[in-house]
Every structure is written in structure tokens, then in C-alpha cells.
Regions:
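Transmembrane signal-anchor helices characteristic of membrane glycosylation enzymes that use polyprenol
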Residues: 42-62, 128-141, 211-238, 471-483
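Membrane-interface anchor segments at the N-terminal boundary of transmembrane helices
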Residues: 78-101, 296-300, 595-694
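Transmembrane-helix signature of polytopic, membrane-embedded enzymes
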Residues: 122-125, 129, 214-216, 316-339, ...
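Specific aromatic-rich, kink-prone transmembrane helix
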Residues: 170, 174, 249, 355-378, ...
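Membrane-proximal lumenal/periplasmic loop motifs of glycosylation machinery
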Residues: 231-238, 251-309
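Transmembrane-helix motifs of polytopic, lipid-linked glycan transferases
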Residues: 300-324
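Membrane-interface alpha helices of multi-pass inner-membrane proteins
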Residues: 411-426, 472
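Membrane-proximal stem/loop segments at transmembrane-domain junctions that anchor or position
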Residues: 487-637
Length: 739
């Protein structure tokens, strides 16, 4: 009992000492600063900044047409014409009431950030705010016109962009400043629940997330995802699913047609991860052998993936409890997985990205446990847990005492499984467990420099274990890709997969300067591309229809023209041309990259691509699939009812304002950026290490083929792991923060 009282007193003292949070005011002082009486001049200045911010939201360059200006002033030219263009780009009275109301609402937070507190002009606020403003201005232009024309296409456009950028910068700097203050507060306070103040709500939340931290979240996730499973049974096809299954059965498929096969009799190849192809194909083969039905085999795979994905999400939530995260944070993470339709949709989608995402989630969770610093100099490296003591009569928590548990054999097994899954379910994915294990080992070795002899020994063992997982994973990957695959005649993937950026740049340059020779009727020919340059490009990409194949948002059509027989000399000649064209028109090359990836930083007006039952049915019915298999969706009344309900809910989330942001890649990318900046300014290197795998996923997206405006599949692993990383890094108690 005395130990419990000492623990409670220590906790209260820690709460009082951290009430202000690192760099933030106390709640009472913040409230006074928000609502105190400011000088009229400061309030007026804040209102003016709020008007500027709302003006940024209302600018629409398409309103300023030549006809509209002619009706006002037919003789307008020069500077006068530019002024008309700028003024007509504003919304006018059409949205005046809404924008005025928004400006009034924004006045209070802007006044508080500018005049009530210091720190608004710190680099950690100003730099991300400026980057956000630039992304909003240029992102809108690329989203609407596939170019920077709306942002810098003339003097009037530049003026409009400066106004819009200034407004977005005001919004962003205020928002980032307040967000960082919220991070400070959440890091110092636990939102507490009690039966007296919350009644049944407290009992339900406690039963859900405390008494059964894994089983109940797993049941909740499985139950809420079940309608999607029933609607999609036996599983959702996407573009690559049929090709992977045909590969396993050694049947013709799109990838084996263009590769130079090392064994013409073996059509299985490394365009898709061979391990995942074997898993999907093996399940289909099992269904045919046992049930005589390929759909039964597909259902086996879907159920397996569904179970693994739901279990990883539940394990993530349960681990947050063991790491000391509060009830509200854990409930929010669980609700995120339950209510965002992307997760249930992907859980039944037959694609490599889902199991790779599960591996990344598991890797992040295990990495967090290894990264935990010692609670005291004599503590062992491993997992921090809460020793919950309860009263049998009331079920109320008496005390929560921080204790330290060893990194168990089960934890090492999960770490190895996560590392192997990341390495084998994504081509090139071996870099993720390698980076995670090396970082974890480095921190364990650093912790081994202090503490008791036993603590140092445990830290060294943890470091050795992390390095052993890395070595085993890399060795297994190399043995599989360099020994087993050649021995079985399995051809590796193409070199073209890593060349999306230069290929897109070349195609855009050809469209802009030499479209007449690159497949565009009536295209340009300004003489900047000579015959030798065309020939050098043709030997690698095929020049005759290069510009016609160019899609600003997706590089697949351009990459598909890659000649697998191109020699090293051909590639060297091509990159020589690429460099000369870069120097000739660098803006074109920058636009090619911006156009292909702006959706990761700008909330596009386009709806993200959803893998629904309608598109799956079309893919199942394609001739190249129908020729060998009879895949089809279950057509029962319950399946149809679930399909309608799931589709309706998904559309609602996509279209309802604010909720629709959960279906935008840019929201998650900016969340990762801002959390990283916050940790960087606090110099929390240990916590930043946990975000390295997530940054790795984003980096892969930014050299990949697709735009985040319409494809979230490539970012899915980062989205899955982000809630866990954010809660562990920022919430009370901050286990990964240095003392």
C-alpha cells in the first residue's frame, strides 16, 4: 500500500511539474490570453489577416475572362487590364457571408498567435507554413491544368498567387503554432476518465480498451469490417491480381511478355514480389485441389489477409496501452481503423501492399519497444508497461505503476516476422527492416553506456538481437533473390521500375518541344530535339509515340515502352540526352515531377481511386482471366445488401466536408511532416528514429509511378503506422523522449 501511495504522489508531482508542457502556457493562462481584452489596433490587425486568409480561399483565376473584362472596360490594357484580372479572380458577393463569418472566427486564434504568445516566427513554424502555402498555390494549378499556368502564367497570375500564398501562410502559421501548443499540452496531461463523471461511458471504454486490450479491439474491428468482407467475397481484384495468379500457374501474363526471361518455360517473375505471388497463387491452387473451385482458394487468401490485418491493428491498439497511452488516445486510434473505410476496403483487396503494410505496422510497434529508454539507471531495455491494480468489487483502477518487462521471445518472433514480411512482400522492402533494426540497435548500445551491470548486459543483448534480426533478414532475402530465384529460373523484375522520374521528364519534354515526332498529331517541333537525341531516347523508351503515352499523373504508360534489351551504353547515351534537356528546360523537368506527385502534398479535388466491387467484377471478367479461371463474386442477398451499404458509406466519407480529408494522401503526409518538425525542434532524436520507416514509405512513393491525388495504395503502409507513431511520440507519457 505504501508503494502505491508513493507512486500516486510521484505521479501527481510529475503532473504538476509538467502542467505547462514543454514550451506551452498552462491551460488557465492560455485561456486568459485567448479571451483577454486586446488593444483595438491588435484586434483590427488580426481581423485584417483573417480577411487575407479567407481571400486566399476565394481566389479563382477562371473568373477573370477576357469577355468579363470587356464588358467592364473595353479599352483596358496593360496595368489596368492586370488589375481587372486580379480583382475579378475574387469570389465577390457570391460567398461574402460565408467568408466574412470565417474571417470573424479566425480573428481570435490569429490574434492569440500573433499578439498573445511568442514563438509564431520560429523557423519550425515559418518554414513548414511557407512550404504549405506554396503547395496549396502550385498544387491547385497542377490539379486543374496539369501545369503551373494558374500560379505563374503571367503577371496577374503571379499577383494572385502572392495574395493566395500570403493568405495560406497566415492560416498555416497560425494552425501550426496552435497545433504545436496542443502537442505540448497533450504531452503533459492525461485525459482521465472516472465512473463518477462519465458513468456508463467510462465502464464501456474501460471494458473495451483496458480489461481486454487485444481481444475486444480485434472483435470490434472484425465486426465493423465484416460487411466489407461479405460484400467483396471471395475478394477484390485490382489490376495486378489476375496477372499474379496466372504467373503462379505458369500462364501468359502481361509481365512475362516484356521481360527477357532467363528460362522461357518459367513465366513466374519478380515484377511483383514472388513471395506474395506464391501466397496468392498457392491459396487459389489449394482451393482448386480441395474444393475444386478457384473462388474458394481466393476466399482462403482473403480470410487470411483479413485476419492478419485486423490482428495487426488490434495489436497496435493494445500495445499503446502497455506503453502508457491514455484511454482517449487509444479510443481515437481504434475509431480511426474502424470508421475510415480505406482499411476495411484494403483488408479484402488482393494486393501486395496490404500485407506489406501489416509488416510495417508490426515493425513500428516492435521498434518502439526497443527504442524505449530506461526508466531509471538500473532498468532493463525492453517494454514499458502499466501494472494495473483493480478492486474486485468495483473494477476501479487503484494505481498505475510504471514497471519494465523484458523483450520476450514472442517479441523477437514478431520482430523477425515483421522484418521478413517487409522484405518479401515489397520489392526492395528489405531496406525498411534493415534501417529499423540498425537504429534500434544503436539506441540500445547507447543505453548500455549507463545503468547497472545487469541493465547494460540486457541493453547489449537487445542490440545484438536487433542486429541478428537484420542479418537474418538480409541473408534470407539475398539467398532467395540471388540463389533460389535463379536456380528455379525465375526472372527478376525490370530496371524500369526505379526510373519513373527521368522517364516522365523525358516524355514531358518531348510533348512540349517535339510532339510532332513523338506521336502527337499537330504537335510542336521547335528544333530543340535533334535526330541523334531522338535515336538515343528511342533505343531506351521508344520515341515514336512517347508524347502520346505521357500521362502527367502516372508513369506506367511511359515505362511500358522501356526496351529490356537496352544495353548499358544505350542507357548512358539516354542519360546524356536527359542531362542536356534538363539544362535546356529545367522548368519542364520540375513540372514533370510536380505534376506526378503533387497529390501527396495538396488535397486534390479528384476522388481517390477506390477498389470497389464494380471494378473488381470487370477485372475478373477480363478475357485474359476468363480464359483460365472463373472468378466471380458471391451473389447472395446478404452480399448484395452489404455491398450497397458499404458503397454508400464510402461515398459519404468521400464527399462530406472534413470527413473527406481522411481519404486524401496529403493529410497524412502533412501530419508526418509536422510531427517530425515538432520532434526536431525539441531535439528528440529517439522519437524521430521511430518515424524513419514511415519516411521511407513516403520516399518510395515519391519515386514511384502514381500520384497521391488518386492512388493511396502506395502510401497505405505509412497511413497504418502513423497513428501509433504519433501517439507514442507525443501523448502522455512521452516514453520515447529523452529526459
Amino acid at each position: 500500500m505504501a508503494s502505491i501511495e508513493r507512486a500516486g504522489a510521484a505521479r501527481r508531482a510529475a503532473d504538476q511539474a509538467g502542467a505547462r508542457g514543454p514550451g506551452g502556457p498552462s491551460p488557465d493562462r492560455a485561456r486568459r490570453l485567448w479571451f483577454k481584452r486586446y488593444p483595438a489596433a491588435q484586434t483590427a490587425a488580426a481581423f485584417a489577416l483573417a480577411l487575407l486568409a479567407t481571400a486566399a480561399l476565394s481566389i479563382d483565376p477562371s473568373n477573370a475572362t477576357y469577355e468579363a473584362i470587356q464588358k467592364i472596360d473595353p479599352t483596358a490594357t496593360g496595368a489596368l487590364y492586370i488589375c481587372y484580372e486580379v480583382l475579378l479572380s475574387f469570389a465577390g458577393h457570391e460567398q461574402a457571408v460565408m467568408l466574412l463569418a470565417l474571417a470573424i472566427l479566425l480573428t481570435l486564434p490569429i490574434r492569440y498567435a500573433v499578439f498573445g504568445r511568442r514563438g509564431l516566427f520560429r523557423p519550425s513554424v515559418v518554414l513548414p507554413a511557407a512550404a504549405f502555402a506554396a503547395c496549396m498555390v502550385f498544387g491547385k494549378s497542377y490539379d486543374l491544368t496539369d501545369s503551373a499556368q494558374l500560379a505563374i502564367g503571367g503577371i496577374s497570375r503571379c499577383i494572385e498567387s502572392l495574395i493566395a500564398g500570403a493568405g495560406w501562410a497566415v492560416l498555416a502559421s497560425t494552425g501550426i503554432f496552435l497545433l504545436f501548443e496542443c502537442f505540448d499540452w497533450f504531452g503533459a496531461h492525461r485525459l482521465r476518465f472516472s465512473e463518477s463523471s462519465h458513468g456508463r461511458l467510462w465502464r464501456a471504454a474501460d471494458a473495451l480498451l483496458n480489461r481486454h486490450p487485444f481481444a475486444v479491439p480485434l472483435a470490434v474491428i472484425a465486426l465493423t469490417w465484416a460487411p466489407t468482407l461479405l460484400a467483396a467475397a471471395p475478394g477484390l481484384f485490382m489490376g495486378d491480381t489476375g496477372a499474379q495468379i496466372r504467373q503462379w500457374f505458369n500462364l501468359p501474363n502481361g509481365t512475362s511478355d516484356y521481360l527477357n526471361l532467363i528460362d522461357p518455360d518459367v513465366l513466374l517473375n519478380g515484377h511483383h514480389p514472388v513471395a506474395h505471388t506464391a501466397l496468392v497463387g498457392g491459396c487459389v491452387q489449394l482451393g482448386l485441389a480441395v474444393f475444386g473451385d478457384e473462388n474458394a482458394g481466393l476466399m482462403i487468401y482473403t480470410l487470411l489477409q483479413f485476419a492478419v490485418t485486423a490482428s495487426c491493428a488490434a495489436y497496435l491498439v493494445s500495445t499503446l496501452r502497455r506503453l502508457g497511452a491514455g484511454l482517449v488516445a487509444r479510443a481515437a486510434v481504434l475509431a480511426f481503423f474502424v470508421f475510415v473505410p480505406m482499411f476495411s476496403n484494403y483488408a479484402v483487396l488482393v494486393t501486395k501492399d496490404v500485407l506489406f503494410g501489416d509488416a510495417v505496422v508490426l515493425l513500428a510497434v516492435q521498434m518502439a519497444k526497443l527504442l524505449l529508454p530506461p526508466v531509471d539507471p538500473g532498468s532493463a531495455a525492453g517494454e514499458v508497461a502499466l501494472d494495473i491494480q483493480t478492486s474486485p468489487a468495483t473494477g476501479l483502477r487503484i494505481a498505475a505503476v510504471p514497471v519494465r518487462l523484458p523483450f520476450t521471445a514472442r517479441d523477437w518472433a514478431l520482430t523477425a516476422a515483421a522484418a521478413l514480411g517487409a522484405a518479401f512482400f515489397r520489392n526492395g522492402g528489405v531496406v525498411f527492416p534493415l534501417a529499423a533494426c540498425v537504429l534500434a540497435a544503436a539506441w540500445c548500445l547507447l543505453d548500455a553506456q549507463r545503468g547497472s551491470r545487469d541493465a547494460r548486459r540486457v541493453c547489449r543483448r537487445a542490440a545484438a538481437g536487433a542486429l541478428a534480426v537484420a542479418v537474418v533478414t538480409v541473408a534470407a532475402y539475398l539467398a532467395f533473390s540471388k540463389v533460389l530465384m535463379p536456380a528455379l529460373g525465375i526472372t527478376p523484375g525490370s530496371r524500369r521500375e526505379m526510373l519513373s522520374i527521368p522517364f516522365q521528364q523525358t516524355a514531358r519534354y518531348a510533348l512540349k518541344h517535339d510532339g510532332a515526332h513523338a506521336g502527337v498529331d499537330g504537335g510542336t517541333d521547335d528544333g530543340t530535339v535533334g535526330e541523334e537525341e531522338r535515336a538515343a531516347i528511342d533505343r531506351v523508351l521508344g520515341y515514336g509515340d512517347l508524347a502520346e503515352r505521357y500521362d502527367p499523373d502516372k508513369s506506367d504508360d511511359v515505362k511500358n515502352g522501356f526496351d529490356e534489351d537496352a544495353s548499358s551504353e544505350d542507357l548512358a547515351a539516354y542519360f546524356g540526352v536527359w542531362l542536356r534537356q534538363l539544362l535546356s528546360d529545367p522548368a519542364c523537368y520540375v513540372s514533370a515531377v510536380a505534376n506526378n506527385y503533387f497529390g501527396y502534398f495538396y488535397p486534390s479535388q479528384r476522388d481517390v481511386w477506390v477498389y470497389g466491387t464494380a471494378s473488381s467484377d470487370e477485372l475478373m471478367a477480363r478475357d485474359d482471366n476468363r480464359a483460365y479461371f472463373d472468378f466471380h463474386r458471391a451473389d447472395g442477398a446478404l452480399n448484395s445488401l452489404c455491398d450497397h451499404a458499404v458503397s454508400l458509406y464510402r461515398v459519404a466519407v468521400q464527399r462530406i466536408p472534413l470527413l473527406s480529408l481522411t481519404m486524401s494522401s496529403s493529410v497524412y503526409v502533412w501530419a508526418l511532416i509536422l510531427v517530425s518538425v515538432y520532434l526536431l525542434r525539441a531535439r528528440q532524436w529517439r522519437a524521430l528514429s521511430l518515424l524513419v520507416p514511415l519516411w521511407g514509405v513516403l520516399a518510395v512513393c515519391l519515386i514511384g509511378p502514381c500520384n497521391g491525388s488518386t492512388y493511396m495504395r502506395y502510401l497505405y503502409p505509412m497511413i497504418c503506422a502513423l497513428p501509433f507513431a504519433v501517439v507514442v511520440c507525443l501523448s502522455y507519457p512521452r516514453r520515447l523522449w529523452r529526459g
